[in-house]
Amino acid sequence: MKIIVCVDDNNGMMFNKRRQSRDSVLIQDIVGSLNSGNLLIDPYSEKLFSNSDVDTFFISEEFLSEAEPDDYCFVENHSLTEHAPRIDELIIYRWNRNYPADTYLDIDPAALGMKLVSTTEFVGSSHDKITKELYSK
């Protein structure tokens, strides 16, 4: 499966059960990266994608367990450790800022045998610079 996450400079993802930030340009980039694939999300993330042009997205609290090998999973509030063996691709969006955090990205791409394939930067709607890193096995 393909995992998509957003992190701060310390790999933080959430604070006090809330996302650290949001950016409409980033959501558009995610939608454009799906290559007609399925997007699976937790109910918490639904409002981020409700007005986007995603052809097929599925909402489930068990989305990581239900994902097929070619599915994309947008992860904000779940641990990835137990699902690590099934991850073939990891897309990390970096806010390039420090935010308070108590939930962190709990996998290391290098430890999973992944290599950095590409890095791109773009200006977001609420961030001067967002970095997109694509890792693959």
Residue ranges and their predicted role:
Residues 1-137:
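Enzymes that bind and transform nitrogen-containing heteroaromatic metabolites
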